[in-house]
UniProtKB/Swiss-Prot annotation:
Ribosomal protein is among the record's keywords: no
Cofactor: Zn(2+)
Subunit-level organization: Homodimer.
Name assigned to this protein: Lactoylglutathione lyase
Residue positions where Phosphothreonine is found in the record: T107
Lineage, top ranks: Eukaryota, Metazoa, Chordata, Craniata, Vertebrata
Record GO terms (molecular function): lactoylglutathione lyase activity; zinc ion binding
Regulation affecting activity: Subject to competitive inhibition by methyl-gerfelin.
Modification N6-succinyllysine occurs at: K88, K148
Xref: PROSITE patterns: GLYOXALASE_I_1, GLYOXALASE_I_2, VOC
Length: 184
């Protein structure tokens, strides 16, 4: 368990856990299914998330009346994706931890269009995290692919983890779950 923190640093472990309730039995089958990011250019974003990070496009849904499309990605085998549209939709929405990319049509051609990544004022959303077997090997590959870094593994005080940016400037933490305990 972490060392007790001074009052000015936030909640102590004890206080944090005392603020939490045991899950209601009715939530037993709930799951965190998706995180959504708005994107400017689906061609750039789909290339980044599939080629650079290795995610698989599970499904694309278009909403012509509202002029937007949704792209659902996850770490899944593309051969497991059902062919039937209804079955595919139910399957997609039952996966754990999917990334939903929302594209509002026309933003890719608007030079003034950009999205706030939450890491500058006013702060809000921070990042998503990707677990990898070897942070240094992954980052070497990212460098070779020309990926923009916010933090390389040996920068700063927290050694062994990195932050990269996607085409819209969203931050992505690159971590190794087996080594994270030695970092924090």
């Amino acid at each position: 368990m972490a060392e007790p923190q001074p009052a000015s640093s936030g909640l102590t472990d004890e206080t944090a856990f005392s603020c939490c309730s045991d899950p209601d039995p009715s939530t037993k089958d709930f799951l965190l299914q998706q995180t959504m990011l708005r994107i400017k250019d689906p061609k750039k974003s789909l290339d980044f998330y599939t080629r650079v990070l290795g995610l698989t496009l599970l499904q694309k849904l278009d909403f012509p009346a509202m002029k937007f499309s949704l792209y659902f990605l996850a770490y899944e085998d593309k051969n497991d994706i059902p062919k039937d549209k209804s079955e595919k939709t139910a399957w997609t929405f039952s996966r754990k931890a999917t990334l939903e990319l929302t594209h509002n049509w026309g933003t890719e051609d608007d030079e003034t269009q950009s999205y706030h990544n939450g890491n500058s004022d006013p702060r809000g959303f921070g990042h998503i995290g990707i677990a990898v077997p070897d942070v240094y090997s992954a980052c070497k590959r990212f460098e070779e692919l020309g990926v923009k870094f916010v933090k390389k593994p040996d920068d700063g005080k927290m050694k062994g983890l990195a932050f990269i940016q996607d085409p819209d400037g969203y931050w992505i933490e690159i971590l190794n779950p087996n080594k994270i305990a030695t970092i924090i």
